[in-house]
Amino acid sequence: MTISGNGSIIAPVLINPNPTTSQAAAIEVGVQANSGTVNIYDNVTLEGNSGAAGSYALRLVNGTANIYGGRFKTAGGLNGDSECIFLQSIKPWGGTYRQCNLNIYGGVFETTGDAKYLINCKDEPYKDGKCAIKIMGGIFVGFNPADNTAEGAHTNFVAPGYKSVETTYNGKQAWKVVKE
């Protein structure tokens, strides 16, 4: 699937009898068993909303997401969660975790909440190698993709041959990923 152009995709504001377990995403990849690839280009905005325990611009449960551009932001979840992109590999029927791959080549990523988990994986599948993140471009507001705590101290999501450089974005501290 390809998403490109101008405009916005906004996650719904959930009214849920149990909002502590609900999740909402502007785009979810991999909900079906045989998931493929989504490619995101251009000036599209993906915006997670509040009103759910998890509120993401993009939630990946199985498959691959390639981000070449766009703006990804979230207002944070009810619990203060700030994941803009969350890799939540699924483990169906007691089997093994499904593979999730995120490749970022460009775009802007930000949250109105605490950015310490701006890009994040579910812990167990990340440790098992079932969630892979390679960042080769983009601007990350309040989050250093080369040195963060999303998966423990000094987590580095930046691909070999690239580095993150501190900058500002709309007056806020940010990091831009560039070639070395």
Where are the model-predicted features located?
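Surface-exposed loop/turn motifs in large extracellular/passenger domains
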Residues: M1-G113, C121-F143, G152-E180
